Amino acid sequence: MVLLVPFDGSDLSRTALERATEFATYRNEDVLALTVIPNEPEYALERGWVDANDPFDIEAIADRMAEQVEAVAPEASFRYEVPEDVSSMASITTDVVRTVRQVANEVDASIVFVGSENAGRVSTPVSSVGSPVSEDPQYDVHIVRHA
């Protein structure tokens, strides 16, 4: 079994990775940090993965995320995925959530550690990944709300 951490480099995702690493010692499980990188330059720009004048390079973004994961949790594994564009009607957030859920299922995640200020609240911003990921009954969810 695996502890899965969707990781975007934010303070909350870093804290979620730290918590998963601490928890892994108690459960004797591996930690997998997952970065989902949509093939959308604006998404990368909004998250601070690239600057406005930088070329959009998925491999370079993945390398930077892997370095950040290594700095926070050297014992964690890192993986990145580029979500499939299944439907032109789906939002980028929907694609990211679907990818996180697919990977969680694939690696048989026992717990997903999500860094989210608003997961589980009554109203959820459209761009929130935390709430939809937390709705899947196949795994437990640890929500980190404070970095």
Regions found by a protein language model. Give the residues of each.
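Small/aliphatic-rich secondary-structure junction motif
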Residues: 2-47
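Short, well-ordered secondary-structure micro-motifs
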Residues: 16, 43-47, 89-94, 124-125
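Acidic, proline/glycine-rich short linear motifs
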Residues: 37-64, 86
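Active-site phosphate/pyrophosphate- and oxyanion-stabilizing loops and adjacent acidic/basic residues
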Residues: 67, 101, 131
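Structural beta-alpha unit
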Residues: 73-112, 119-120, 139
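Gly/Ser-rich helix-loop-strand patches that form or flank binding pockets
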Residues: 110-147
